[in-house]
């Protein structure tokens, strides 16, 4: 059984027991979060919403927070002695899918 959920403008395919790194949101560790923006559920037969399935939800358990590896942005203009170097680390919230209710 799997579901396709929408969170933070992105879509994720999830199954029970999966771990995900979602965009950072405020939640305490060991707390449960319910997502009701379920686009599709497959439990032997595929159910697709328009755009969401009414009454379906995915329950997530917050494991913790963290940061991704650094991405380096480097810009240079030739022969101008102009350069720019920046770094960026995306913050995420790590969650575990505990149940899918369709």
Swiss-Prot record:
Coiled coil: none annotated. GO terms for molecular function: rRNA binding; structural constituent of ribosome. This protein binds to 23S rRNA in the presence of protein L20. Pfam families: Ribosomal_L21p. It comes from the Bacteria. Belongs to the bacterial ribosomal protein bL21 family. One of its GO terms (cellular component) is cytoplasm. Part of the 50S ribosomal subunit. Contacts protein L20. The keyword Ribosomal protein applies. Keywords: Ribonucleoprotein, Ribosomal protein, RNA-binding, rRNA-binding. NCBIfam families: L21. This is Large ribosomal subunit protein bL21. The lineage of its organism: Bacteria, Pseudomonadati, Campylobacterota, Epsilonproteobacteria, Campylobacterales. One of its GO terms (biological process) is translation. SUPFAM superfamilies: L21p-like.
């Amino acid at each position: 059984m799997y579901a396709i959920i929408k969170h933070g403008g992105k879509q994720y395919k999830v199954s029970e027991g999966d771990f995900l790194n979602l965009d950072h949101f405020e939640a305490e560790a060991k707390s449960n979060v319910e997502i009701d923006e379920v686009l599709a559920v497959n439990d032997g037969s595929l159910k697709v919403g328009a755009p969401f399935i009414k009454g379906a939800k995915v329950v997530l358990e917050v494991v913790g927070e963290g940061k991704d590896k650094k991405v380096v942005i480097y810009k240079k203009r030739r022969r101008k002695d102009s350069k720019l170097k920046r770094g960026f680390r995306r913050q995420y919230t790590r969650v575990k899918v505990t149940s899918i209710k369709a």
